[in-house]
């Protein structure tokens, strides 16, 4: 999951980052 988070943050930015953070909390 951590690796995916990095990829998302690097690929997109704030929008994707927020979405990923929400999923992690879930």
Swiss-Prot record:
Free-text comment on the cofactor: Binds 1 copper ion per subunit.
Q: Which reaction does it catalyse?
A: 2 superoxide + 2 H(+) = H2O2 + O2
What the record says about family reads: Belongs to the Cu-Zn superoxide dismutase family.
Q: Give EC number(s), comma-separated.
A: 1.15.1.1
What keywords tag this UniProt record? Answer: Antioxidant, Copper, Cytoplasm, Lipoprotein, Metal-binding, Nucleus, Oxidoreductase, Palmitate, Zinc
Q: Name one GO molecular function term.
A: metal ion binding
The encoding gene is sod1
What processes in GO biological process is this protein linked to? removal of superoxide radicals
Name of the protein in question: Superoxide dismutase [Cu-Zn]
Where is this protein localized, as stated in its record?
Answer: Cytoplasm; Nucleus
Its chief place of residence is cytoplasm
């Amino acid at each position: 999951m951590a690796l995916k988070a990095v990829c998302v943050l690097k690929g997109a930015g704030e929008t994707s980052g927020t979405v990923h953070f929400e999923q992690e909390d879930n």
